[in-house]
Curated annotation (Swiss-Prot):
Coiled-coil residue windows: none
UniProtKB keywords: Sporulation
UniProt protein name: Small, acid-soluble spore protein P
Induction and repression of expression: Expressed only in the forespore compartment of sporulating cells.
Main location class: other
Source taxonomy: Bacteria, Bacillati, Bacillota, Bacilli, Bacillales
Organism: Geobacillus kaustophilus (strain HTA426)
Entry's Gene Ontology BP terms: asexual sporulation; sporulation resulting in formation of a cellular spore
Family membership: Belongs to the SspP family.
UniProt xrefs under InterPro entries: SASP_SspP
NCBIfam families: PRK09399.1
Keyword Methyltransferase recorded: no
Pfam family, one: SspP
Record's subcellular location: Spore core
Length: 48
């Protein structure tokens, strides 16, 4: 059972270790969102 937990923990750790890689795509999405936000800045009411 402990082994299974360890494996699961390792799997969970894998994505955690990929955190530096995850923020990369997130940053890209944020950049796109930011771009949209800037464009929607005129439509702030709509964004709200």
């Amino acid at each position: 059972m402990t082994n299974k937990n360890d494996g699961k923990d390792m799997r969970k750790n894998a994505p955690k270790g990929d955190n530096p890689g995850q923020p990369e795509p997130l940053d890209g999405s944020k950049k796109v969102k930011n771009r949209n936000h800037t464009r929607q800045k005129h439509n702030t009411s709509h964004d709200m």
